[in-house]
Amino acid sequence: MADGSGARFPRFSELCAKYAAQLAAAETRSVYAFSARPITGGEPVSLGFLRGRVLLIENVASLUGSTVREYTQMNELQRRLGARGLVVLGFPCNQFGHQENAQNAEILPSLKHVRPGNGFEPNFMLFEKCEVNGARAHPLFAFLREALPAPSDDMSTLVSDPQLIAWSPVCRNDVAWNFEKFLVGADGTPVRRYSHRCQTLAVEPDIEALLPPPARGYYA
């Protein structure tokens, strides 16, 4: 189609195709391009269904010295801020001291009866075991490490004992231990990374800054 000057207007189909290409390019810079299989099995779930939510992503382990504290705090954060748009995601990983050596089907019973125990059940999204470093790293974690090369609270964090490194290649942006944290904004863009030394609840102020204010009458 052209106007009186002879200039050609783009067809509607061309505009739609251009917009779709722009969306696809944006997806590659966000977590929405990735999927993961729930710990209970079934088909992989696209993280695109979490569009508009603030995400806290952690690599977790059920036999770590921090397991009780971090799992409990992850539950607490989800309870406090879930209604306002926070979604906590946990990815079991056995790359650090072999502290997640159970099969996928054994992890939930272990959490319930051993650590944290006392009937504990995660109220956040837990996915199947994966690797977070090396050639077989889950694509989501490869993306997160590239986007956020070092924890903001400890830029020098590295695996303390080289004998514990059980993956290849080794990269400067590798996750150093269980319970590192990646905060992702509501647009799917990684915002901040935290070391395993940073407790989960310590991230709450940064999460609050990304969430809408509580509705009147809301109580945590």
Curated annotation (Swiss-Prot):
CDD domains noted in UniProt: GSH_Peroxidase (cd00340)
Pfam name, any one: GSHPx
Reactions this protein catalyses: 2 glutathione + H2O2 = glutathione disulfide + 2 H2O
Signal peptide extent: none
EC nos: 1.11.1.9
Keywords: Oxidoreductase, Peroxidase, Selenocysteine
GO biological process: glutathione metabolic process; hydrogen peroxide catabolic process; response to hydrogen peroxide; response to selenium ion
Site (Subject to oxidation and hydroselenide loss to dehydroalanine): U64
Family annotation (InterPro entries): Glutathione_peroxidase, GPX_AS, GPX_CS, Thioredoxin-like_sf
Keyword Lipid metabolism among record annotations: no
UniProt key word Oxidoreductase: yes
Active site, per annotation: U64
Post-translational modification: During periods of oxidative stress, Sec-64 may react with a superoxide radical, irreversibly lose hydroselenide and be converted to dehydroalanine.
One MF annotation (Gene Ontology) recorded for this entry: glutathione peroxidase activity
Additional free-text comment from the UniProt record: This enzyme has been acquitted by lateral transfer from its human host and has retained 74% identity with cellular GPX1.
PANTHER family, per the entry: GLUTATHIONE PEROXIDASE, GLUTATHIONE PEROXIDASE 1
Main function: May protect the virus and component of infected cells from oxidative damage by peroxides whose formation may be stimulated by infection.
Record-given protein name: Glutathione peroxidase
